[in-house]
Curated annotation (Swiss-Prot):
Organism listed in the record: Caenorhabditis elegans
Active-site feature positions: 156, 198
Entry EC no(s): 3.-.-.-
Hydrolase recorded as keyword: yes
Family recorded in the similarity comment: Belongs to the peptidase C13 family.
Domain of life: Eukaryota
Protein name: Putative GPI-anchor transamidase
């Protein structure tokens, strides 16, 4: 009888612990990121000078994720239009996302696919890893089952498609097929898909692969809008959704240890700012987005701390 009472007391004590701090620790463990590396595929699908903003969309986001630790080796950037060298550009060799901003096209920018290289086929090949054997490593998405992958698409779109080069279309079925192939080949751990175009929510309608969180700048029946026009060059320089994305990352995610979560990011561009209703699909994403850090997708998997003071290594260190 005494042993029975001891066992009963132990069970009660265990339940009490589970309902307090221990349970919180267990919950935190399940939300701990399981990835070891981060990758990004940033795609501007539009050609022509008047689509200047789609190039600056990609470049602005590129600089944000590089600031948060994702290296060029883990970023595949595709620009369908060579805006910096366009003869209409009054500031040759530059791209700006704001009238009083900084040049986004500096010497530290690495473009992997440009101009006519940016096609539906090349994009699908990047995702699936099915390249010609001579394709260099810099043009390959070398992900594995522990990779968190950010896919960002910007350009012109319609119901169930995005235009590439104004001559062909990437359909939502094409995108879903590529992501499913990635899942079957263990090419990602978790994925964030962002489509910034008109009617962009239609692009994730067919995605059924697990661990994929999908976002869009507009719903299927809505347009997506530009943000700022530069009268000196006569075109819009960034889209609203990307502007508020970069603004959020700049102000709220200043370092890799930021506590900003994905719900904060989703809420960063309400309809009063974006002028359209942003789309979210999370039925294939098992985690609570309030408990997923923004840096799980927009930053490096490793936290770096920059030191400003001088460090002197004495003889004992080298012994």
């Amino acid at each position: 009888m005494r042993h029975v009472l001891l066992i009963f007391c132990a069970i009660i004590a265990t339940e009490a612990l589970l309902n307090t701090g221990l349970q919180l620790k267990i919950d935190e463990l399940f939300d701990t990121p399981g990835h070891t590396n981060n990758w990004a595929v940033l795609v501007c699908t539009s050609k022509f000078w008047f689509n200047y903003r789609h190039v600056s969309n990609v470049l602005a986001l590129y600089h944000s994720i590089k600031r948060l630790g994702i290296p060029d080796s883990n970023i595949i950037m595709m620009l369908a239009e060579d805006v910096p060298c366009n003869s209409r550009n009054p500031r040759p060799g530059t791209v700006y996302a704001a009238r009083a901003g900084t040049n986004l096209y500096g010497s530290d920018v690495e473009v992997d696919y440009r101009g006519e290289e940016v096609t539906v086929e090349s994009f699908i090949r990047v995702l699936t890893g099915r390249h010609h054997p001579a394709t260099p490593r810099s043009k390959r998405l070398l992900t594995d089952h522990q990779s968190n992958v950010l896919i960002y698409l910007t350009g012109h779109g319609g119901d169930s498609f995005m235009k590439f080069q104004d001559s062909e279309e990437l359909t939502n079925v094409d995108l879903a097929y590529a992501i499913q192939t990635m899942f079957e080949d263990n090419r990602y751990h978790e994925m964030l898909v962002i489509a910034d175009s008109c009617r962009s929510a239609s692009m994730y309608e067919w995605i059924d692969s697990p661990n994929v969180l999908s976002l869009s700048s507009s719903l299927t029946h809505e347009e997506s809008y530009s943000y700022d026009v530069d009268t000196d060059i006569g075109v819009y320089v960034i889209d609203r959704y990307t502007h508020y994305t970069v603004n959020f990352l700049t102000k709220e995610v200043k370092a890799l240890n930021s506590s900003a979560n994905m719900q904060d990011y989703i809420d960063s561009c309400p309809a009063r700012k974006c002028l359209s209703n942003t789309g979210v699909r999370k039925d294939h994403y098992p985690k609570d987005v309030k408990r997923v850090r923004v840096t799980d997708f927009f930053g490096s998997s490793r936290i770096f701390q920059h030191l400003s003071e001088e460090i002197v290594l004495d003889d004992e260190f080298w012994a």
